[in-house]
Regions:
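Short conserved segment of the HATPase_c
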Residues: 116-129, 185-186
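Conserved catalytic submotifs in the C-terminal HATPase_c
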Residues: 27-30, 49, 54-64
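Conserved glycine-rich
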Residues: 155-156
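Conserved micro-motifs of the catalytic ATP-binding
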Residues: 21-26, 65-68
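Short alpha-helical segment of the dimerization/phosphotransfer core of two-component systems
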Residues: 1-6
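A conserved beta-strand-to-alpha-helix junction within the catalytic ATP-binding
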Residues: 27-42
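Short helix-loop "hinge" at the ATP-lid/N-box region of the Bergerat-fold HATPase_c
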Residues: 84-85
Length: 192
């Protein structure tokens, strides 16, 4: 277990270093966020079940296509879901909501925190800053920082909201151009 934690920490530090230096080559493609969310939900089902967390997921009826790096976008969702799995109060609900409007795809994840959120939303995306009470949990303290940087690198926006013990993360991306869209999960764009 210690070896796995050390490996994860090392990977997070390397990833954070690459992101902050801008030393990442993005492989942009059209990604259907509906399918990616379903995959993420499947990956995290056991972790959520272990803490008796119920995931309430709301998805649009049509594909939600964004033009991003599929691997990096997966990392963003993984970090956000992992954050919820670690810090949500056991026995509560996690709400994952994906919607589209005319120009945007908007994803939000919210949960009730097991610990008091006695710091600002900005502090949550600073590297290594976590509340003292959460230091007993696994992790590098880099997850939200990495997620925010990866979203920005791909032209999106990640916003965090704290209200008492309620935590909410919202990710916004511009919809992919209509001519680029199809329902493939990872499709390389032929123009690149």
């Amino acid at each position: 277990a210690k070896a796995q934690r050390l490996k994860t920490l090392t990977e997070d530090v390397v990833e954070a270093s690459k992101v902050s230096s801008g030393n990442i080559n993005l492989q942009l493609m059209d990604v259907n966020l509906v399918e990616m969310m379903n995959q993420t939900t499947g990956e995290f089902a056991e972790k959520f079940e272990h803490k008796n967390l119920e995931l309430i997921q709301t998805l649009p009826n049509e594909p939600a296509i964004i033009h991003v790096d599929g691997r990096r976008m997966w990392r963003v969702l993984e970090n956000l879901y992992n954050n919820a799995a670690k810090y949500a109060m056991p026995g509560t609900r996690i709400y994952a909501d994906l919607r589209t409007d005319k120009d945007e795809v908007i994803f939000s994840l919210k949960n009730v925190s097991e610990y008091p959120l006695n710091f600002s939303a900005d502090e949550l995306t600073e590297r290594f800053i976590r509340g003292d009470i959460s230091r007993s949990t696994e992790g590098s303290g880099l997850g939200l920082s990495i997620a925010k940087s990866l979203v920005q690198m791909q032209g999106g926006k990640l916003e965090l909201y704290l209200d008492g013990d309620l935590f909410k993360a919202t990710v916004r991306f511009r919809k992919a151009d209509k001519k680029e869209q199809d329902s493939c999960f990872f499709r390389e764009n032929s123009e690149e």
